[in-house]
A protein has these predicted regions:
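Short beta-strand scaffold segments in enzyme catalytic cores
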Residues: 85-90, 222
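Short, hydrophobic/amphipathic alpha-helical patches that form generic packing surfaces
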Residues: 219-227
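ATPase catalytic-site recognition across NTP-hydrolyzing enzymes
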Residues: 12-79
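Histidine-centered active-site/metal-ligand motif
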Residues: 216
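Short amphipathic alpha-helical "interface-anchor" segments enriched in bulky aromatics
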Residues: 25, 33-36, 191-195, 221
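Signature of the SF2 helicase/ATPase Hel1-core->accessory helical subdomain module
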Residues: 1-11
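Mg2+-dependent endonuclease catalytic cores in nucleic-acid-processing enzymes, primarily RNase H-like
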Residues: 88-212, 229-251
Length: 251
């Protein structure tokens, strides 16, 4: 027979409080949580959202969060060129924000993602993308925003902010969020793994996050936080005129 037990330093009283305080002063939050509080969620050195996501998990905000047909779904994108594209699906319900779904794929064109949007049968509100969606491509002379418009996908542009400001906005937003455990599983794992590397020379974490497989989901999440905070007059609505009254993805 096997017995599994968890003994957290904050609960057992076996370690002197002064010793724990000293350990906190010498460790990062994640290191302390792993070493003294038996946290398996805080095991990524330099994790950017580790603390906030652990609090969301322990607070019961990573659970079953189904689609509510009474509220529109907003989408938040990081569009890659020859790389991954990531999409978060959210619903604002009062002061809470439900993160109900996540999708990521790579080496696919915009028609593929339009098909994915259709397949989910959500009632959509706004579709939001970063400023570089307006950059014109050399081959076609069109921006990806114009290409999306031709496909019936109507994007708004999220204001451009420094990465660190966007990260701070995301950290401040997470306490308001409820995540669907299953549909957001991949995206949540990316957020947990999103981190800064350690500089042995300066004995500190570098300012810029590591760019790896977790970055696309984290970038889309950052645009989500910035866009939600800045939504209103500062969000640039589409200026193009519709060719038809019917727009299945109208913002």
């Amino acid at each position: 027979d096997w017995l599994a037990a968890v003994y957290k330093a904050s609960e057992t009283g076996l370690l002197d409080q002064d010793e724990l305080t000293a350990a906190k002063s010498m460790m990062t939050y994640d290191q302390y949580q792993q070493e003294f509080e038996c946290s398996w969620n805080a095991n990524v050195p330099g994790a950017i959202y580790g603390k906030e996501l652990e609090e969301a998990t322990t607070g019961g905000r990573v659970s079953n969060v189904p689609y509510d047909p009474a509220h529109k779904v907003d989408t938040w994108w990081d569009l890659g060129i020859g790389d991954s594209t990531s999409i978060w699906y959210t619903q604002t319900v009062g002061r809470a924000v439900h993160v109900i779904d996540y999708y990521e794929n790579r080496n696919q064109g915009l028609p593929h993602y339009c098909q994915i949007l259709n397949s989910k049968n959500y009632l959509y509100g706004t579709h939001n993308a970063p400023h570089d969606i307006e950059v014109r491509e050399l081959g076609s002379g069109k921006s990806r925003r114009e290409v999306a418009w031709d496909l019936g996908l109507n994007f708004r542009v999220v204001p451009k902010l420094p990465i660190e400001d966007g990260i701070h906005a995301a950290q401040m937003l997470i306490p308001r969020l409820w995540f669907d455990r299953e549909k957001c599983k991949q995206g949540l794992e990316c957020l947990r793994q999103y981190h800064r590397s350690y500089n042995d020379r300066t004995r500190s974490f570098r300012a810029n996050p590591v760019h790896d497989w977790s970055s696309h989901a984290a970038d889309a999440f950052r645009y989500f936080a910035v866009g939600l905070r800045e939504s209103g007059p500062t969000m640039r609505a589409p200026q193009m005129q519709a060719m038809s009254d019917y727009d299945p993805f109208a913002a």
